[in-house]
UniProtKB/Swiss-Prot annotation:
PANTHER family: GDP-MANNOSE MANNOSYL HYDROLASE, MUTT_NUDIX FAMILY PROTEIN. Residues 1-141 form the Nudix hydrolase domain. GO terms for molecular function: dCTP diphosphatase activity; dTTP diphosphatase activity; dUTP diphosphatase activity; magnesium ion binding. Catalyzes the hydrolysis of nucleoside triphosphates, with a preference for pyrimidine deoxynucleoside triphosphates (dUTP, dTTP and dCTP). It comes from Salmonella newport (strain SL254). InterPro entries: Nucleoside_triphosphatase_NudI, Nudix_hydrolase, NUDIX_hydrolase-like_dom_sf, NUDIX_hydrolase_CS, NUDIX_hydrolase_dom. This is Nucleoside triphosphatase NudI. The gene is nudI. The keyword Magnesium applies. Keywords: Hydrolase, Magnesium. Belongs to the Nudix hydrolase family. NudI subfamily. Monomer. Its EC number is 3.6.1.9, 3.6.1.12, 3.6.1.-, 3.6.1.23. It catalyses: a ribonucleoside 5'-triphosphate + H2O = a ribonucleoside 5'-phosphate + diphosphate + H(+); a 2'-deoxyribonucleoside 5'-triphosphate + H2O = a 2'-deoxyribonucleoside 5'-phosphate + diphosphate + H(+); dUTP + H2O = dUMP + diphosphate + H(+); dTTP + H2O = dTMP + diphosphate + H(+).
Amino acid sequence: MRQRTIVCPLIQNDGCYLLCKMADNRGVFPGQWALSGGGVEPGERIEEALRREIREELGEQLILSDITPWTFRDDIRVKTYADGRQEEIYMIYLIFDCVSANRDICINDEFQDYAWVKPEELALYDLNVATRHTLALKGLL
């Protein structure tokens, strides 16, 4: 089984949290709402990976004013690729508290939508199990 280390930002701006809706046809949680983030590349430092993933998935314009390591967790997930293949992966999630200075987002094709959500409205979204666990651990659900 392949192992992946995943950097995952919990991004907050003015009391709201950023959620991204995964594409319907790929990823670990197709069609569900999630936090952004992705895998650490070989030789890449953790914060470099976090900033690269944010740039790739959310665009160059989003400015983070604070990044603080928060917690980690692990589990085994099945990833679905765009061509329909599936793979079981051991995932190690490194989760960061992030504060953004703005809300300028330009999502890539991994996502179909995004939203800045008030804490009291987070439970209204179809959150994937990993995001639900993270938000509950944070006391937001």
